[in-house]
Structure formats: structure tokens, C-alpha cells
Regions:
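A glycine-rich helix N-cap at a beta->alpha junction
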Residues: 2-6, 10-11
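Metal-dependent amide/peptide-bond hydrolase catalytic core
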Residues: 10-30, 34-212
Length: 212
């Protein structure tokens, strides 16, 4: 069975985690899932000189705005595990905060969301990546399409994300489906209590001076 994989993944972060002064080398213990959804909105076609209220681009824009304003739910387990693995490199104050997540959850959430790296660690991410609608400036298109890309946190699932998307959009005239070849579930989380993990951890510390 494969013990570990070394590729271009991971990073050395500086100043990203509050309460940690040293650079932090990230060792991936899981792989996020992937889901690209194609959204398609239908509307009444026509001429721009006489626009109606049922415009495809407007309907699609409202759906995308709702998805952008309502990110997927927060789960702090991965961030808590990271803090625990950093041990004494984490300030006492931050250790206290993460030992009492039940009380400090709103503060942790606010700080994590302020940084794109830590925000991606606490939730399934939502990215609006492609939009297509209309072929001429004075023509109302009959439909408009967009691609929204999600990176699934381990423990989340394609079915759960699709269900949330449906509830967030709340518009039966906006259909969506996974892009062909663009959907796979997140992996399971590997244990850090293994010989291969410890070897990798000690090797990184020898190669990159001063990292934790």
C-alpha cells in the first residue's frame, strides 16, 4: 500500500496562521473533492428595445449572486487538527482559543474567512469561474450559462453540495448539472500517527531551516 506521495502540493506559509510566528510547512493528509456545475437559466428572448422582466442573463446573475453571498458551511476540524499538530509553535492564547471552540467559534470563523488560504481549509469553496450569455448587444438571449467550481472538504459530498445549491438558488428556472468529467468526491483523511508521516515531517524540517 502507498505510504506517501511527494508532488507539487503543499506550501510553506508565513504569517497566515494567527499565533504562529514561524513558517509552517503544510503536509497534505487528504485531497479535496472537485465539482464543476453548469448552471443554465431560461428567459424570454426578444429585442433589447422592449425588454421584459424574464431575462435569462438577469435570472442567472441573481442565482450566481446568491451562491456568492451564501458560501458553504464552516467546519473547523481541519484547522483545529493543524493547530494541534503545530504544538508548542502555537502561542498559548491560540491554544486556549482552539481548546474552547464552543465559545470562540465566531472569532475563529471570522479570522479564518479573512484569508483565502485558511478560508479554503474550513469549508467547501465556491468559485464563479465562467459565464456565457448573449451573442449581440441588442438581442435578449433565450438562455445563459455559467460554471461554478466547488472544492469539496473531506466529509462533504457532491450530493450535499448540490442540495445546498438548489436551496440557495431557489429558482426552478435555473437548472444545473455536473460538467462531464468534472466531479469526484473528497478523499478520506490519512492519519498523522504513522511512520511515513513522521519521516516526511522530520525531512522537511531538515531541508527547510526554521519551519514547523
Amino acid at each position: 500500500r502507498l505510504a506517501a506521495m511527494v508532488d507539487e502540493g503543499g506550501a510553506i506559509m508565513e504569517g497566515t496562521i494567527s499565533g504562529v510566528n514561524e513558517p509552517v510547512a503544510l503536509i497534505g493528509t487528504a485531497e479535496k473533492g472537485h465539482l464543476s456545475l453548469k448552471l443554465r437559466a431560461e428567459g424570454t428572448p426578444g429585442h433589447s428595445s422592449m425588454p421584459g422582466k424574464d431575462m435569462a442573463i438577469g435570472r442567472l446573475a441573481r442565482a450566481l449572486t446568491r451562491l456568492d453571498a451564501n458560501p458553504q458551511p464552516v467546519r473547523l476540524k481541519a484547522l483545529k487538527d493543524l493547530i494541534n499538530n503545530l504544538g508548542s509553535a502555537v502561542s498559548f492564547g491560540m491554544q486556549f482559543v482552539f481548546s474552547n471552540i464552543w465559545f470562540f467559534r465566531p472569532i475563529i470563523k471570522m479570522q479564518a474567512e479573512a484569508n483565502s488560504t485558511t478560508n479554503a481549509m474550513i469549508r467547501t469553496s465556491t468559485a464563479l469561474t465562467m459565464v456565457n450569455g448573449g451573442i449581440k448587444e441588442n438581442v435578449l438571449p433565450a438562455n445563459a450559462e455559467a460554471i461554478v467550481n466547488f472544492r469539496l472538504l473531506p466529509g462533504d459530498s457532491i450530493a450535499k453540495v448540490c442540495d445546498r445549491v438548489r436551496k440557495i438558488i431557489k429558482d426552478d428556472k435555473v437548472e444545473f448539472e455536473p460538467v462531464a468529467g468534472g466531479a469526484w468526491e473528497a478523499s478520506q483523511v490519512s492519519s498523522t500517527d504513522t511512520k511515513s508521516y513522521l519521516i516526511l515531517k522530520h525531512t522537511i524540517r531538515k531541508v527547510f531551516d526554521g519551519v514547523v
